[in-house]
């Protein structure tokens, strides 16, 4: 093999090396050509559909999910680019015969695609969600050519809805609060937005089963009453399609809480499978009274397999379902130890966990990263359900809360989930509304903040600086 043939050049795509050729380098390709598409090439998720079809809702939820499972993902909302370029006046900006506006909109799309390239090829992103109408074949061809030039995979998500009640509700919930309509009369907003939809309908070209048979896509009809999936290419696209087939928009609330205070909580010991303390039992009855006062229709109750969650649920006097996936994080060799004992016997492990709490795995135990993977089926079922009460544990509750509140892996292990407090999560248009309800039963504090000094050579006093008081 010649020296030239043996050289490898790293492309801007993550961790991909290709043979170097001095005569026709792929890195110096001419415009319009393409680079190879590898198995782990980044993916562009392209939204398609008329306005008020839930595209931004889908984009936001999908991005939150993919980030939660560890796939770096970012939304690029074309409406934001357009608002930065020009102030909105009325629906006439979207008329197909408004050539000046058409040019502005195309320039905004190109600016967004430039940022997509920066994110996927330079900032270690793996999935870019291009949130726009993309209703014409011309616009989709532009995006496909862009993806081909940079070696990205493409997966289309088309949301189709012909139910006028669903469309009207979407306009009411989302568009009335849009930056395009600040301080506008509600009736005028509705009138203008319906005319905007009419502008798009003139040139709308849905994905076609025959003409687009070579493309990868999922079509969602009437917010999930029917799906059509075509040519799923890889793991990311498969998980995306599966996730989208599990979400719904039915109004509901999810109640998250920890078990009542346990005997090991009182003694400052982590893990184990102890029963409730006297105050923990008092909380269990307080929780039962609270749930009854809420008059929640068709409530499902989930617990872990551990004694303390089961004892808490028993006080409710209703059927409950046990999930092994909801068990507390496995602390391995550190099970039932206090933080002081861990520092004494495993000072290096204690410091390593403080350095990267999300990825650190207890010897013979689990990490938060492991726990997220274990909880993915729970998240899928929560998305499918309506009203649910989940009685779980501190680390588990942190993982679930991070999903619903879109928290990063750095934030996740330090989310505060105190004992004897219920969090009521109500999904709204682009996020989740949180209500914290303390049930007025005292309990020990089990939250430990990250200490300032996380070095392995630190003094024991520095390592234990943030340990909460216990008996």
Swiss-Prot record:
For this protein, the record's InterPro entries field holds: 6Pfruct_kin (IPR003094), 6Phosfructo_kin (IPR013079), His_Pase_superF_clade-1 (IPR013078), His_PPase_superfam (IPR029033), P-loop_NTPase (IPR027417), PG/BPGM_mutase_AS (IPR001345)
**Source gene?**
Pfkfb1
Q: Could you give a GO molecular-function term held by this entry?
A: fructose-2,6-bisphosphate 2-phosphatase activity
Binding of beta-D-fructose 2,6-bisphosphate occurs at 258, 265, 271, 308, 339, 353, 357, 368, 394, 398
- Record keywords: Acetylation, ATP-binding, Hydrolase, Kinase, Multifunctional enzyme, Nucleotide-binding, Phosphoprotein, Transferase
One Gene Ontology term of the biological-process aspect is: positive regulation of gluconeogenesis
Known regulation of activity:
Phosphorylation at Ser-33 inhibits the kinase and activates the bisphosphatase.
Q: Catalytic activity annotated for this protein?
A: beta-D-fructose 2,6-bisphosphate + H2O = beta-D-fructose 6-phosphate + phosphate; beta-D-fructose 6-phosphate + ATP = beta-D-fructose 2,6-bisphosphate + ADP + H(+)
Q: Which residues bind ATP?
A: 49-57, 170-175, 350-353, 394-398, 430
Using the record's annotations, give every residue carrying the modification Phosphoserine.
Answer: 33, 141
Region annotation (6-phosphofructo-2-kinase) ranges: 2-250
Pfam families from the entry?
A: 6PF2K (PF01591), His_Phos_1 (PF00300)
Binding locations of beta-D-fructose 6-phosphate: 82, 105, 133, 139, 175, 196, 200
Q: What does this protein do?
A: Synthesis and degradation of fructose 2,6-bisphosphate.
Q: What is this organism's lineage?
A: Eukaryota, Metazoa, Chordata, Craniata, Vertebrata
UniProt-listed SMART domains: PGAM
Active-site residues, Swiss-Prot/TrEMBL: 131, 161, 259, 328
EC number per UniProt? 2.7.1.105, 3.1.3.46
Q: How does it assemble?
A: Homodimer.
Q: In its UniProt entry, what is this protein called?
A: 6-phosphofructo-2-kinase/fructose-2,6-bisphosphatase 1
């Amino acid at each position: 093999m010649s020296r030239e043939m043996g050289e490898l050049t790293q492309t801007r795509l993550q961790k991909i090396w290709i043979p170097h050729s001095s005569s026709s380098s792929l890195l110096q390709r001419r415009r319009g050509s393409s680079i190879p598409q590898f198995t782990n090439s980044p993916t562009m998720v392209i939204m398609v559909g008329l306005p008020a079809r839930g595209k931004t809702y889908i984009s936001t939820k999908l991005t939150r999910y993919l980030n939660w499972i560890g796939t770096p993902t970012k939304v690029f909302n074309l409406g934001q680019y357009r608002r930065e370029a020009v102030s909105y006046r009325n629906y006439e900006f979207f008329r197909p015969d408004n050539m000046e506006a058409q040019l502005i909109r195309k320039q905004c799309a190109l600016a967004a695609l430039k940022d997509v390239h920066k994110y996927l090829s330079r900032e270690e992103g793996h999935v870019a969600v291009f949130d726009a109408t993309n209703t014409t074949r011309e616009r989709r061809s532009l995006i496909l050519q862009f993806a081909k030039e940079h070696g990205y995979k493409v997966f289309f998500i088309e949301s189709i809805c012909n139910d006028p009640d669903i469309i009207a509700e979407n306009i009411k919930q989302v568009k009335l609060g849009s930056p395009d309509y600040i301080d506008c009369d509600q009736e005028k907003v509705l009138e203008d937005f319906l005319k905007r939809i009419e502008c798009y309908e003139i040139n709308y070209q849905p994905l076609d089963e025959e003409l687009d048979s070579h493309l990868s896509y999922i079509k969602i009809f009437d917010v999930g009453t029917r799906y059509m999936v075509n040519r799923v290419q890889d793991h990311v696209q498969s998980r995306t399609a599966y996730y989208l087939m599990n979400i719904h928009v039915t109004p509901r609330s999810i109640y998250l809480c920890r078990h009542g205070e346990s005997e090991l909580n009182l003694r400052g010991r982590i893990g184990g499978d102890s029963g409730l303390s006297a105050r923990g039992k008092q909380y269990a009855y307080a929780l039962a009274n609270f749930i009854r006062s809420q008059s929640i229709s068709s409530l499902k109750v989930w617990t872990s397999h551990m004694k303390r969650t089961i004892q808490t649920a028993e006080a409710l006097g209703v059927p409950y379902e046990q999930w092994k996936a909801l068990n507390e994080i496995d602390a391995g060799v550190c099970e039932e130890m206090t933080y002081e004992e861990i520092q004494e016997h495993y000072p290096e492990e204690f410091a390593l966990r403080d350095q990267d709490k999300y990825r650190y795995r207890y010897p013979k135990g689990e990490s938060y990263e492991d726990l997220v993977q274990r909880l993915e089926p729970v998240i899928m079922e929560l998305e499918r359900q309506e009203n649910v009460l989940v009685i779980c544990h501190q680390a588990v509750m942190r993982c679930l809360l991070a999903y619903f509140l879109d928290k990063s892996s750095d934030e996740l292990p330090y989310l505060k989930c105190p004992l004897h407090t219920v969090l009521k999560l109500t999904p709204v248009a682009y996020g989740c509304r949180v209500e914290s309800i303390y049930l007025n039963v005292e309990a020990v504090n089990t939250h430990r903040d990250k200490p300032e000094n996380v070095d392995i050579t630190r003094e024991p006093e520095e390592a234990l600086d943030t340990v909460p008081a216990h008996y």
